[in-house]
Amino acid sequence: MASQLTDAFARKFYYLRLSVTDVCNFRCTYCLPDGYKPAGVTNKGFLSLDEIRRVTRAFANLGTEKVRLTGGEPSLRRDFCDIIAAVRENPSIRQIAVTTNGYRLARDVAQWREAGLTAVNVSVDSLDARQFHAITGQDKFRQVMAGIDAAFDAGFEKVKVNTVLMRDVNHHQLDTFLNWIQSRPIQLRFIELMETGEGSDLFRKHHISGATIRDELLKRGWIHQLRSRADGPAQVFCHPDYQGEIGLIMPYEKDFCASCNRLRVSSVGKLHLCLFGDGGVDLRDLLAEEGQQAALMARIETALLGKKQTHFLHQGNTGITQNLSYIGG
């Protein structure tokens, strides 16, 4: 095995976020308010199953322990179960997760688990069915809730729920969310709204710091937990009276990037060193044949030397990220 992926700032990278499509059937206000429009797809289309197999093998050989399958909506891929199984072929990858809008969970989550999936994140921005419809453009609230129940029934001990925190939309609904997770092993993660190229007006209107939630949690006796090395950037809080947990993801917080441990590969095979970085390094020409593994690994290692110490969101620089479906958030 090659040496562990490490950048110029001694950060080690154990975590790959792999987008398998940028197509999504929801129209979330903060991501694709006008619905999906094909943009970044080349004539080759999205990564094939064999290309996914090769890129994940290269990352596994470079020390990756966790792969998250993202989109768009990854479950729109008809071969999604095969994708999970292909990633599972790497014994050093201990965690295989998916981030999903949840609309296919009730139908398919048991099959995903059987294929090798170890963790599920579901996007739910409101626990009010009408507001959920207004945010997502889809009247699927009950279907998504049934999907979360199905994930528990399939044997997942914990489900993570991602909630984009928005001023005057859901920031004042903390009590509703806390009641929901009191008797459920759900880690509810409030994610600060991030500015994207297409979403700057929305950002100015609805951004609110996660610190408002953190202050309220601490006031109510919630306890800040320590992070493990393959964890994401969430600050996680627990409470003895609650089965669930609260996570806060605050990209505008000081030193947010100091604990960065993930790299991203887009659905067309570009390596992105940062969600809000410029450009991307094309890996696709090295995904055609089995004999290209050494060259592929070398390109990944070389590219990592160019990773910057921090994003530049504070200066309003969102890089190439026009919307979050492009790289997979």
Curated annotation (Swiss-Prot):
Lineage: Bacteria, Pseudomonadati, Pseudomonadota, Gammaproteobacteria, Enterobacterales
Disulfide bonds: none
GO terms under biological process: Mo-molybdopterin cofactor biosynthetic process
Binding site for GTP: R17, R68, T99, K160, R262, L263, R264
Species: Cronobacter sakazakii (strain ATCC BAA-894) (Enterobacter sakazakii)
Reactions accelerated catalytically: GTP + AH2 + S-adenosyl-L-methionine = (8S)-3',8-cyclo-7,8-dihydroguanosine 5'-triphosphate + 5'-deoxyadenosine + L-methionine + A + H(+)
Protein name, as recorded: GTP 3',8-cyclase
Pfam families attached to this UniProt entry: Fer4_12, Mob_synth_C, Radical_SAM
Gene3D superfamilies recorded: Aldolase class I
